[in-house]
Amino acid sequence: MLNHQSTYKIQNATLGFKEEIERLKVQAAMSWEKEFRLLKWYGLQNGMNVLEVGSGPGYVTEHLLQRLPDSYITALEIGKTLQNHAKQLLNGYSTNRIKYVEASVYDTNLPDNSFDFVIARLIFLHLYHPLEAAQELFRVLKPGGRLVIIDIDDGIFGTVNPEIPSLHNILMKISQYVSQRGGNRLIGRSLPRILINSGYIDIEIDSVIQHSDVHGIDGFKRQFDIKRLIPFYKNGVITSEEFEQMNKAYEALNHSAEAFAMMNYIVACGKKPLSI
């Protein structure tokens, strides 16, 4: 059996499988245009051999297939349930366009020096050993190839209107709880160092800002779905007062025309040297 070494397993999703899949679908679409613009700026081109790690249910994979019609996409995902969903979603695409690999990001079983570009979106925050993952992706990249990591940092998560007075404290409590279980919701600030320590050069770091007035409110409703916080409340991670503040924000996002939200992703890129 494959060892996940990760805090994310869809069977443990608080929302349940169907709602979690829908959340991932909306999440993939919200800032895709801005993310793709950055990917191109980092060097992603049509015709490249592309690896997407942590490809999940296939929604980002579908965007890549649509925008890179001459590229071959390898979708690596350790979760069989998620990969089966991706195969159903993308069954109209030829096997000449896409390959599915069920493997760990720590041990991909892929050949050395085989990919022009690797994309790791919202996976590093879950990994017990992010440095090992970055080193494995370094191995499979061609010399001159690039790894782009898109992830979060709850220290600069974003903001909500109406304001949640305890939002930062709530996020820090949840981050600490996740950290004790092997994840890192503050991973964004560490991405340049992870890349440097894995051998990458020409490090770049940027951010992708999402705003409900620009990207739609639906994704933020799902991000702030109060059901996602119930386990943290039940386990004593957040107080009843903090839970109620988040619940009021969730209700406002669903019912108030005055409500809005802004959220931030960190994007880091590193290049494998031409000679090692």
Locations of regions flagged by a protein language model:
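C-terminal helical/coil "lid" or tail adjacent to the Rossmann-like core of SAM-dependent
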Residues: 10, 20, 204-259
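A short acidic, Gly/Pro-enriched loop at the edge of an enzyme's catalytic core
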Residues: 106-117
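Conserved catalytic/acceptor-binding region of the Class I
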Residues: 148-216
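Class I SAM-dependent methyltransferase Rossmann-like catalytic core
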Residues: 7-32
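A short glycine-rich, Lys/Arg-flanked "PGG" loop and its adjoining helix->strand segment in the class I
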Residues: 131-146
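Conserved alpha-helix/loop element of class I SAM-dependent methyltransferases that forms part
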Residues: 29-46, 63
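A short SAM/SAH-binding and catalytic strip from SAM-dependent methyltransferases
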Residues: 116-131
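Class I SAM-dependent methyltransferase SAM/SAH-binding core
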Residues: 51, 57-107
